[in-house]
Amino acid sequence: MYRVHKLLSMIGYCSRRSAERLIESGQVTINSKIVTPGDKWFVGDELKINGVKIDLSLLNKQEIEIIKYHKRLGEVVSRDDPFNSNTVFNSLPDIEGRWISIGRLDKNSSGLLLFTNNGELANKMMHPSSAIEREYIVETDQMISKDNLSLLCEGVPINNGLVGKFNKIINISKNTYSIILSTGKNREIRNSLKYIKHKTQ
C-alpha cells in the first residue's frame, strides 16, 4: 500500500511534486476511478495516467541509480518544453523507468547536475530539510559592495513573496563569486542579484 504520489516517484515516473500536479488535474485513475490527493494504491490495483496503464512490475525490484551530467549552455532541464527541444534528457543513457533531475539549472547556466531513477531519493535530496549545499560560480556586471554581500546572506525579496538567501558568497576574483545555497528556488541567484541592481554575465 502506497499513497499514489509517493508510488509514482518511487518507480521513477516523475517527482513527487509532479505526481501531485497530475493527481490534482484529474489525470490519474485507480481501477477507473479518478484519484484524489491522499488516495492509496494497493497491490492488484490498476493505475493509469491519461488512460495509459502504468507498469508497476519494477516496484521494489529497481536498483537505485545516480549519474552526474554536465549541463551545457542552451540546454533545458525539462522533458516538455514546447519552445526548445534541446533537453538534457536526450543526452542521458537509456534505463528502465525514467531519469529524474536532482535540482536544475536554467537555460542560460551550465554546470554539474545529478540524476536518479528514484523519485523518493530525488525528493529527499531537493527538500530544504536535507540542507544539501550547492555551489554556483557567478560572474557579475560589477563588483558587489560589502553591504550588499551581507544583505544577500540576510535575505532579499525575489518574487511571489519568496526570499532569496545565500548561505555564503565569496569573491573569487574581480567580478566572479562563489555562491553557496541550500535551497533551489527558480532563478534565485539572478533575481537576488537583480534586487541589488546587479546582473549575471
Residue ranges and their predicted role:
Residues M1-Q201:
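Basic, flexible Lys/Arg- and Gly-enriched helix-loop patches that mediate nucleic-acid binding at interfaces
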